[in-house]
Amino acid sequence: MLISVENAEHYIWGEVCDGWHLLRREDMSIIQERVPAGGAEVIHYHNLARQFFYILEGEGTMVFEGQEIVLKKGQGMEIPPQVRHQFMNQSNADVHFLVISVPSTRGDRVHP
């Protein structure tokens, strides 16, 4: 089945951020997300899931092991299981990105 943000399951998180489930299986998920300027998720980690964040448009900041790493269009970053991380948008424009998780993060999100 052909999938895009036009026909994918949509959800809102953090009151102002968008997510679209492009692939939603227990063994893997791919989500396209949009975070507006100033938006952020809370710091957390996953016990099992390994994630890869890939910037499609704009730039975002990943807090990872005490560092702030700026990711720009065409750049990605792997987050291993059990590593605290936080994605935020400190720019003046929306950031669009993919989050690929193996296995799915459903039920595997821990807020320290």
Please place each PLM-identified region on the residue numbering.
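A short, N-terminal "cap"/entry segment at the start of jelly-roll beta-barrel domains
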Residues: 1-29, 42, 109-112
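Short strand-connecting beta-turns/loops that link adjacent beta-strands
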Residues: 27-28, 48, 92-93
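Conserved short histidine dyad/triad with adjacent acidic residue
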Residues: 31-46
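Glycine- and acidic-residue-biased ligand/ion/polar-headgroup-sensing regions
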Residues: 48-50, 54-60
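Cofactor-binding loop segments of dinucleotide-utilizing enzymes, especially the Rossmann-like FAD-
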Residues: 57, 65, 100-102
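Structural motif
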Residues: 59-61, 68, 84, 94
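Short acidic-glycine-tyrosine-enriched beta hairpin
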Residues: 67-81
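Ligand-binding loop in jelly-roll beta-barrel domains
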Residues: 81-107
